[in-house]
Amino acid sequence: MMRSYVAVLVALAVAIGLPMAASAQARPLDAAQARPDLSGNWIRGGRIDFGPWDFTEAGRQKFESYDFKKDDPAYGCIGASWTRVWLNPNVLVRITQAAETVRLQYEWMDIDRRLPLVDSASPNPKRITIPKMPALGRSTAWYDGDALVIDTIDFAPGYVSTMEKWAGMPQSRSMHTVERLRRTGDVLTVETTHVDPTYYRKPLVVSIEYRKSEFELMEYGCTPEDAAVVAPR
């Protein structure tokens, strides 16, 4: 089973460019190479596709023991995972692209993600964390053709989702995610591949569509005191 899982990881690395040891050796981005224009304000709208998942026994037990009344970190104004952040409806994401960085400002929880752009072949790229949100790990980014790729490791234990029928899908410290952001017209597709051998027998792929928006980014202003008022009891 482990040999099969490793084979899946190798195939995944080749397909999407995960910077695992001895995996993708993508060429550095030429400074003159055109980058996709992802800038602007976006709001969730359109397709959400959770690919099939196959829990390990530990993953199944973790999923079945989830209790939203005490396990959802949103009641403490904390994002559970990047997929959970992207899933939130009716709030904006503003993307700002610069020569050496890309900034994603999420209205939900006022998350400000300032990512360094790196060489995808670097064995030890610069990564950033989000203060007070350890479940969001350490991230770095690069461009790959028409996509912005965001690679994240070192997650704290948490949940891929705390929403709808996916609530309680777990993530462990071994979780490794790759987000690929692509734009087609006024549609932004965020495809996230989750690799977590502790809880899943094969990679979990989630795809979420966003639409261009004329609304402006606003302060979310969550405080633990306010969140506690609406928290279930």
Question: PLM ranges: what are they?
Answer:
Residues M1-Y5:
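Positively charged n-region of N-terminal signal peptides that target proteins for export
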